[in-house]
């Protein structure tokens, strides 16, 4: 489902021409625990932050992207890596390495997605599930530059059938598509259009808790935002 979201965003950039200059993404960790951000760039876009790095509590890291950059960011949790960068994460793992290169995060994972251009399109997506509170805030810019994200900790309200647990604790919340693999939850087959794929009771749990985040594949109207000539702050645990 994440690939569907990136493809949609990539098409959106055709509505605007490329702006000059660069965009700065500042990743901020307000969690009480270390987060290992992963980055995945779209076709033709440069890799940011070597694909992944460590972000300690209270730390921030700026990453500079070209004006046509597209891709996504996510947070990995409970990771352990050796000196060569090999290891694993309990949530959001990207192939047992610190630097994700061209591997996306293993669901369930909260995603911050971007396609930059004359108009930047951005969203926070829970289509692939949830693992870390996450927000995107535009810095400067003009347009519909509202903050997108999921501030709530969905692990505390995740339905039991979607819960991912470790040592008796809920550590992530799966999407209904991942949990049940049916067309009505995955928006595939006979349910593969906005007209035939409606919000489910599970996506409504996500939407109620996080009204500016994507809760299912066709949740565009209240979940995609546009801004021009802005930089962006991506915050893990924004309410902390």
Curated annotation (Swiss-Prot):
Q: Does the keyword Kinase apply?
A: no
Q: Which CDD domains match?
A: TLP-PA
List keywords of the entry alphabetically: Allergen, Disulfide bond, Pathogenesis-related protein, Plant defense, Signal, Stress response
SMART domains annotated for this entry? THN
Q: Which tissues is this protein detected in according to the database?
A: Strongly expressed in pollen grains. Also present at weak levels in seedling roots, in sapling stems and in developing male strobili.
Quote the InterPro entries the UniProt record gives. Osmotin/thaumatin-like_sf, Thaumatin
Q: At the top level of its lineage, which domain of life is listed?
A: Eukaryota
Question: What turns on this gene?
Answer: Weakly induced by abscisic acid (ABA).
Q: Which residues form the signal peptide?
A: 1-20
Q: By its UniProt entry, which Gene3D superfamilies does this protein fall under?
A: Thaumatin (2.60.110.10)
Instruction: Provide the function of this protein.
Output: May be involved in disease resistance.
The name this protein goes by in its record: Pathogenesis-related thaumatin-like protein 3.5
């Amino acid at each position: 489902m994440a690939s569907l979201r990136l493809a949609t965003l990539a098409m959106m950039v055709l509505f605007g021409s490329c702006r000059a200059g660069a965009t700065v993404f500042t990743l901020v960790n307000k969690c009480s625990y270390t987060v290992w951000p992963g980055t995945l760039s779209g076709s033709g876009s440069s890799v940011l932050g070597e694909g992944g790095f460590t972000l300690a509590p209270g730390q921030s890291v700026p990453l500079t992207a070209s004006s046509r950059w597209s891709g996504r960011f996510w947070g990995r949790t409970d990771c352990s890596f050796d000196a060569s960068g090999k290891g694993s994460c309990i949530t959001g793992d990207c192939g047992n390495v610190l630097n994700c290169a061209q591997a996306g995060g293993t669901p369930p994972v909260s995603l911050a997605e971007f396609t930059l251009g004359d108009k930047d399109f951005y969203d926070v997506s829970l289509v692939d599930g949830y693992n870390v509170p996450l927000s995107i805030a535009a810095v400067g810019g003009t347009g519909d530059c509202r903050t997108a994200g999921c501030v709530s900790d969905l692990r505390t309200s995740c339905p039991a059938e979607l819960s991912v647990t470790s040592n008796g604790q809920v550590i992530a919340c799966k999407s209904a598509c991942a949990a049940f693999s049916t067309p009505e939850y995955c928006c595939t087959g006979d349910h593969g259009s906005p007209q035939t794929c409606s919000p489910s009771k599970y996506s409504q749990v996500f939407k109620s808790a996080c009204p500016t985040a994507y809760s299912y594949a066709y949740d565009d109207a209240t979940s995609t935002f546009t801004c021009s000539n802005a930089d962006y702050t991506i915050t893990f645990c924004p309410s902390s």
